[in-house]
């Protein structure tokens, strides 16, 4: 086995050109070990004194037990090596084996040569040859074989392998003479005592021929030591064959070889090639032939070689560190590291000169740091004092593969620090992550952590839910057991009373044979036909059961004529049921459902005791158990049905939200859209923009300005990007990469790179949500200050908006609170967790604050102790203005004193309008400066002066539909503020109006079974109101009977529907008595003339309204003006088709099937109803006639339209998104 002694660097420190002649050393052919590893070193200067200046070697020996190997070694250019003439082998014990395998060796010589040719470098090898005759011999003769042809030439680096001193069995003959004072290249003399051949590599020396310096002296010493060690007798026990077949030296020989290596290392520590050598090349082992057995002691040999290598590496490291320590000490630098080039996923040793640090008087020195600007993997460890010259302390730190720099400070473990004069210490990691890659890595780590936390939270919730389910199931089981026990007791009481009346037999009317029987016995039951009301019956049947008809009619038998002659006796055979205590029966003239005459013992039925029945106690235990099982099964079925319905509802909600988001993104497709539509974090997205539909129409250039996360992303706004023309018409496009931590993409467009005219969506900017990001949008805090809230204090639509909008925004992961007066007429049964919160004083009045949950929303109830809200009503007091003004001021004071700092304060209509100016005048500079005011107009008919003042002070203002906002834009209180005035359509509460879970309709339904559900609802409505049960078109009208609602158009539509053979149902009442009486007269007229096709219900009925929405084919809403309108939205939720006048919110939500296809497409919708323009009879006829004709002539198309409108989302999902955009726009304002 070859035991290499590798060098990590050149043994000589420098290579200086000499004037003397240099030898070019050529490889020895034929005897080079096939496992030789090449090493690049400098050419050696040949000194006249013949001393070896540097040696790299290994010792190997092949004993007679090894087969010979034919090795082909690559030759260098030049003359052939001299000497080494093959010799005949001497007698040896393994000669026959060698000869036998000679043929095999010949066939393997080619592969062995290839192995030697792996290195492209020139190799030099020296060999010590031993024979079997004398393995203990000592090398005594040294011959240097010179290559005269290569004497002249300049100094050049040559490539050679680590030189070996090897022992190998060879067949050769001695050639040449002995010269023990000089060793010549390419010649060798076999020592007769040992048979060793020595090949030495001559290292290049610095200086001229006559110059003698420390390096040359060291080289001379190495040569001397080599010579001395080769004079030592090698004992057999000092040799051990390794798994490569070579011999490893042990004992004095190995020790002296190690000393030579160390001496060489000390003399050449300044080599420039220390870091460039590939140490792995020194440790390649000889290949082992497949049929060559492994020698014993292989493990020990390998460990010894490894130990030698590690020891040499440690020496090299120590010497390099000592050099760095000396250099930094001389320069007064207190910090260095080794290795000097720090790489990722490796260890680095950090050295601190405590004497030059602020810690020079401290006994403990610690390092505290982290990687990548203190953002990754912090560490703290103690430094230890070193042996280096100077007060050097050190520690090792592992550099993670994600690092691009390390940052650290030193301290004494308490309060004394060395932080590089406040700048901290840092080390750059070469080849580490780029900063942007590390940012993405951190984001991915954060995402994984979030996923982990989410899974853990989900598991905790699952376990908690499972525990709740188990506890609830236990409670339900106990409840079922109690109920079973109670029902069994009731049955027991009844049966005992019946058993008292029951008899064993009655000879005159009936009897049983045999008289003694038990359960499951077959008996004959005889009946005397002549004794009762069936004396004239042609046939006789028994209808029977047991135990007070426990299982209903379980015995049905036809009786036959008996042979008994003392009466008209008939009989039948009956099997006594199991568990029967007594039998119950009646006689009839026919089977069930066909019998006419009965004999039921004068309405008491017949009863007969089973004489040998089971013990009663046992029966009642079993009965109670059966009742319990029945209750359990019924409960299981109920819960399964309920679970299925809940899951279906949740699925529908999710699908509806997804459709709404898609329609939200497509609603601006005529201006801008993206590919893909759903933007994913970490991917690229292309933005398409159509300037033809914007203020940038006709501009020669369009520039795209983009950022993320509401313009707050860490990367800041991206550089402006010039958009390029797209393939589709007037669109232009730009592509950007979406960061991993993006949750929103924000952009605007401009005509020039430096600005000019902007399209920023009227100050709102364009925003598109990003999905799959590691960052989530931080929640906003919105506070509604209102005087109405459904369902606890609802008067009109304002209360619905406050509750429904708040729930929708809260569902989008924002924080919502509501401040409401504590009326004495609140519906407290809808308030959960109601409790006292605090009290405070304002305006000389104590105000108590209560807290509760309403529809899942946090509500603070303000109760001033001056009695302003103890009037038994919401509106209707003479001092309503004073009451609500006080409430608005008190609400702002509550926010201030309570430490609230909401992002948005949202006030509604005239009643909470004072919040806007009170905030700006008294609170914006006193702790609530962060907040922005949003004001919503629900009804412009009341408090116009208050609304105008609120418009002036609000940051953003809205009304309940875009069209209505245009219709009122000319109003004097609105016109000056159009720049901040927006229309957002209201929504409906999908939980209140839900045909799948509506308890007021006969069959729950969705869009999948809309025809079945609406058919059943129509039939139920017709039955309830006494209308004709016929398949006719039914028009429903649900409204307040006021002139705003178009009562003259309503009357005309009723007559038109009846003329078209339809049915009409109206539900509503009039606040004006004259109008109410007018409709009472109309109802009387219609009920007398069209009693089976018209019904006017002139008082509001909530359950009936649900049934009308579900059972009607059409819902008519002919309003003269309508700010938003919820009736048409509710109608579509139930699959009814709206017929409306084009005004306000009706125009924004209903798209005519014949005229509004393009307008609907721009909103991401499909046409969904019939509409008309005028406010006269002709307009109503135009829409209503088309609707009725569609029902009559195209029923399949009409049914598909019902399904289509049911799938449209008219909840608060979309309005909530619009309000959030408005809130964000308000927050941007200074």
Curated annotation (Swiss-Prot):
It is found in: Plastid, Chloroplast; Plastid, Amyloplast. The keyword Chloroplast applies. It comes from the Eukaryota. May account for most of the soluble starch synthase activity in the tubers. Contributes only a tiny percentage of the granule-bound activity, but may also contribute to the deposition of transient starch in chloroplasts of leaves. This is Soluble starch synthase 3, chloroplastic/amyloplastic. Induction: By sucrose under illumination. Its EC number is 2.4.1.21. The gene is SS3. It comes from Solanum tuberosum. One of its GO terms (biological process) is starch biosynthetic process. Pathway: Glycan biosynthesis; starch biosynthesis. Keywords: Amyloplast, Chloroplast, Glycosyltransferase, Plastid, Starch biosynthesis, Transferase, Transit peptide. Residues 66-189 are annotated as: Disordered. Tuber, sink and source leaves. Signal peptide: none annotated. Belongs to the glycosyltransferase 1 family. Bacterial/plant glycogen synthase subfamily. Residues 124-145, 177-189 have a biased composition (Basic and acidic residues). InterPro entries: CBM25 (IPR005085), Glyco_trans_1 (IPR001296), GS/SS (IPR011835), Ig-like_fold (IPR013783), Starch_synth_cat_dom (IPR013534).
């Amino acid at each position: 086995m070859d035991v290499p002694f590798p060098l990590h660097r050149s043994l000589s420190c420098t290579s200086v050109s000499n004037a003397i002649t240099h030898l070019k050393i050529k490889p020895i052919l034929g005897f080079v070990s096939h496992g030789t590893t090449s090493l690049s070193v400098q050419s050696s200067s040949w000194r006249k004194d013949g001393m070896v200046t540097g040696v790299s070697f290994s010792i190997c020996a092949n004993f007679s037990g090894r087969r010979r190997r034919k090795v082909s070694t690559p030759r260098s250019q030049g003359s052939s090596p001299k000497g080494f003439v093959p010799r005949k082998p001497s007698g040896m014990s393994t000669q026959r084996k060698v000869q036998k395998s000679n043929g095999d060796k010949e066939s393997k010589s080619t592969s062995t040569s290839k192995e030697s040719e792996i290195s492209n470098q020139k190799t030099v090898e020296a060999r010590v040859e031993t024979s079997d005759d004398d393995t203990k011999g000592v090398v005594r003769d040294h011959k240097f074989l010179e290559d005269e042809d290569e004497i002249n030439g300049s100094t050049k680096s040559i490539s050679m392998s680590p030189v070996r001193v090897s022992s190998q069995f060879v067949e050769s003959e001695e050639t040449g003479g002995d010269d023990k004072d000089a060793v010549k290249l390419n010649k060798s003399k076999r020592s007769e005592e040992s048979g060793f051949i020595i090949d030495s590599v001559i290292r290049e020396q610095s200086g001229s021929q006559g110059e003698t310096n420390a390096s040359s002296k060291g080289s001379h010493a190495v040569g001397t030591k080599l010579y001395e060690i080769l004079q030592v007798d090698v004992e057999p026990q000092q040799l051990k064959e390794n798994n490569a077949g070579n011999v490893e030296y042990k004992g004095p020989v190995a020790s002296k070889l190690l000393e030579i290596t160390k001496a060489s290392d000390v003399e050449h520590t300044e080599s420039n090639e220390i870091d460039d050598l590939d140490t792995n090349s020194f440790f390649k082992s000889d290949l082992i032939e497949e049929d060559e057995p492994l020698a014993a002691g292989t493990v020990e040999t390998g460990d010894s070689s490894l130990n030698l290598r590690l020891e040499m590496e440690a020496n090299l490291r120590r010497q390099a560190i000592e050099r760095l320590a000396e250099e930094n000490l001389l320069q007064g630098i207190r910090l260095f590291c080794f290795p000097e080039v720090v790489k990722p996923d490796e260890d680095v040793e950090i050295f601190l000169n405590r004497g030059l640090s602020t810690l020079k008087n401290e006994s403990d020195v610690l390092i505290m740091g982290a990687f990548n600007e203190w953002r990754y993997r912090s560490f703290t460890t103690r430094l230890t004092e070193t042996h280096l010259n100077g007060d050097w302390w050190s520690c090792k730190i592992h550099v993670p593969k994600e690092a691009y720099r390390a940052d650290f400070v030193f301290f004494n473990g308490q309060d004394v620090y060395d932080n590089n004069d406040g700048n901290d210490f840092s080390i750059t990691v070469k080849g580490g992550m780029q900063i942007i890659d590390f940012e993405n890595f951190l984001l991915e780590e954060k995402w994984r952590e979030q996923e982990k936390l989410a899974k853990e939270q989900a598991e905790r919730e699952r376990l908690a839910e499972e525990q709740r389910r188990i506890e609830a199931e236990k409670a339900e089981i106990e409840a079922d057991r109690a109920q079973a026990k109670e029902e069994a007791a009731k049955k027991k009481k009844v049966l005992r009373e019946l058993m008292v009346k029951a008899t064993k037999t009655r000879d005159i009317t009936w009897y049983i044979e045999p008289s003694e029987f038990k359960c499951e016995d077959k008996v004959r039951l005889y009946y005397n036909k002549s004794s009762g009301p069936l004396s004239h019956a042609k046939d006789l049947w028994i209808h029977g059961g047991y135990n007070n008809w426990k299982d209903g009619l379980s015995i049905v038998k036809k009786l036959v004529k008996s042979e008994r002659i003392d009466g008209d006796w008939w009989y039948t055979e009956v099997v006594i049921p199991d568990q029967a205590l007594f039998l119950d029966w009646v006689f009839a003239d026919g089977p069930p459902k066909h019998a006419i005459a009965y004999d039921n013992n004068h309405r008491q039925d017949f009863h007969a005791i089973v004489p040998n029945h089971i013990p009663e106690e046992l029966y009642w235990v079993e009965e109670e158990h059966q009742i319990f099982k029945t209750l359990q099964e019924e409960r299981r079925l109920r819960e399964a049905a309920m679970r299925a319905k809940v899951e279906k509802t949740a699925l529908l909600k999710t699908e509806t939200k997804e459709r709404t988001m898609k329609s939200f993104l497509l609603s601006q497709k005529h201006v801008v859209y993206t590919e893909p539509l759903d933007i994913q974090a970490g991917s690229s997205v292309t933005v398409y923009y159509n300037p033809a539909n914007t203020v940038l129409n006709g501009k020669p250039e369009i520039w795209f300005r983009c950022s993320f996360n509401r313009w707050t992303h860490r990367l800041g706004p991206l550089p402006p990007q010039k958009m390029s023309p797209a393939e589709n018409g007037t669109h232009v496009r730009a592509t950007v990469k979406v960061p991993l931590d993006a949750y929103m993409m924000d952009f605007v467009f401009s005509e020039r790179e430096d600005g000019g005219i902007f399209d920023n969506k009227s100050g709102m900017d364009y925003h598109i949500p990003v999905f799959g990001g590691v960052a989530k949008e931080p929640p906003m805090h919105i506070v509604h200050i209102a005087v109405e809230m459904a369902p606890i204090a609802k008067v009109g639509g304002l209360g619905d908006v406050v509750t429904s909008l708040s729930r929708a925004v809260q569902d989008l992961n924002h924080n919502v609170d509501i401040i409401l007066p504590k009326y004495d007429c609140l519906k407290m049964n809808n308030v959960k967790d109601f409790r006292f919160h605090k009290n405070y004083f304002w305006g000389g009045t104590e105000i108590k604050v209560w807290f509760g949950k309403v529809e899942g929303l946090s509500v603070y109830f303000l109760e001033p102790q001056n009695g302003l809200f103890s009037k038994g009503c919401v509106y209707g007091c003479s001092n309503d203005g004073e009451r609500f003004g006080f409430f608005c001021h008190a609400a702002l004071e509550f926010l201030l004193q309570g430490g609230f700092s909401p992002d948005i304060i949202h006030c509604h209509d005239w009643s909470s309008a004072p919040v806007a100016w009170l905030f700006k005048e008294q609170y914006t500079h006193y702790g609530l400066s962060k907040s922005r005011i949003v004001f919503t107009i629900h009804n412009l008919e009341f408090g116009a002066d208050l609304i105008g003042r609120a418009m002036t002070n609000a940051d953003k203002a809205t009304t309940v539909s875009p069209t209505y906002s245009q219709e009122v834009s000319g109003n004097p209180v609105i016109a000056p503020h159009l720049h901040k005035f927006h229309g957002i359509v209201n929504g409906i509460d999908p939980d209140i109006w839900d045909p799948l879970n509506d308890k007021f309709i006969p069959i729950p339904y969705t869009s999948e079974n809309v025809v079945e559900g609406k058919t059943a609802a129509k039939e139920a409505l017709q039955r309830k109101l006494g209308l004709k049960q016929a398949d006719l078109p039914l028009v429903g009208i649900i409204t307040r009977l006021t002139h705003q609602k178009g009562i003259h158009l309503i009357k005309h539509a009723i007559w038109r529907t009846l003329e078209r053979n339809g049915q009409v149902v109206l539900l509503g009442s009039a606040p004006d008595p004259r109008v109410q009486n007018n409709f009472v007269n109309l109802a009387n007229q219609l009920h007398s003339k069209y009693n089976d096709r018209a019904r006017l219900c002139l008082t509001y009925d909530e359950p009936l309204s649900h049934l009308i929405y579900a059972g009607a084919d059409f819902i008519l809403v002919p309003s003269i003006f309508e700010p938003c309108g919820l009736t048409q939205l509710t109608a579509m939720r139930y699959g009814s088709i709206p017929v409306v006048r084009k005004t306000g919110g009706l125009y924004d939500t209903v798209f005519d099937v014949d005229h509004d296809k393009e307008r609907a497409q721009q909103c991401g919708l499909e046409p969904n109803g019939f509409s008309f323009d005028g406010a006269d009879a002709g307009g109503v006829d135009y829409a209503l006639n088309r609707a009725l004709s569609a029902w009559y002539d195209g029923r399949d198309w009409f049914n598909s339209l019902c399904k289509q409108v049911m799938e449209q989302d008219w909840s608060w999902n979309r309005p909530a998104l619009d309000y959030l955009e408005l809130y964000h726009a308000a927050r941007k304002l200074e």
